[in-house]
Regions:
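PRPP-associated nucleotide enzymes
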Residues: 2-9, 13-16, 25-228
Length: 228
């Protein structure tokens, strides 16, 4: 089945989106919502006409250096990692958390627990769940009680995804503290949430996007500034 949609921007600009086949990969895509339609359509991000790559902000080496610095900062801030655990926000946050875990193991000689939470606006059947992101799955095979939980995500934007992830952690127990580590902070917060560890701060406009790419999901490593 093929879907046809139009991505309606706040400015009222209509941008046609190419159809997405059933067999198309969802690994590098974009949810497009039709106001009043009650449905969301998943469309390949590179099929959206008018979205262009404006600049490459970080290459593979820069991403690696940023993650290593974040790993050192997490260990230093917490005076070691004996009581630290990592929780990645799927999908790229989970992958970044695993990389930070491996870095910390090389630095401190300890392998910290690492889990994930799945935060989304939509069910797999494309029906909108909520105006705010909700947690559909939490995979924590360890206790968070009296631990310092470090949430990991690729891009920090409004703060709503981070808030949903924090709520999921709190439902699993009472941690000593919750910290937030992100590869890129692009600003435009809608909630009073601030990252404790930031790989790179990138001020953006509302017509710009930050796209973090990882080989596990995108076939390459890098951070790109996209423009609508």
């Amino acid at each position: 089945m093929l879907y046809f949609a139009q991505w309606i921007l706040k400015t009222g600009t209509e941008m046609p989106v190419k159809p997405l086949g059933d067999t198309a990969s969802k690994s590098a895509g974009l949810w497009c919502v039709l106001p009043g339609a009650g449905k969301a359509f998943f469309c390949c991000e590179r099929a959206v006409r008018g979205v262009r790559q404006k600049a490459k902000l970080m290459d593979e080496a820069a991403v690696g250096r940023a993650l290593m610095r974040l790993s050192h900062e997490i260990a230093e801030r917490n005076r070691g990692v004996e009581n630290v655990c990592l929780v990645g926000i799927r999908r790229r946050g989970e992958t970044l958390a695993e990389r930070i875990r491996d870095n910390i193991e090389r630095i401190e000689g300890l392998r910290v627990p690492c889990g994930s939470v799945d935060v989304r606006y939509y069910r797999d059947d494309l029906e909108r769940l909520s105006d705010d992101p909700i947690v559909t799955k939490a995979q924590l095979e360890f206790s968070v009680v009296d631990r310092t939980v470090v949430l990991v995500d690729d891009v920090l934007y409004t703060g709503r995804t981070a808030r949903a992830a924090m709520e999921a952690v709190l439902k699993c127990g009472r941690p000593r503290a919750i910290q937030l580590a992100v590869l890129v902070d692009r600003g435009h917060r809608e909630l009073p949430i601030r990252a404790d560890f930031v790989g790179k701060n990138v001020p953006t406009s509302h017509t710009e996007l930050i796209e973090a790419r990882l080989p596990e999901h995108d076939g390459e490593t890098g951070v790109y500034l996209m423009e609508l």
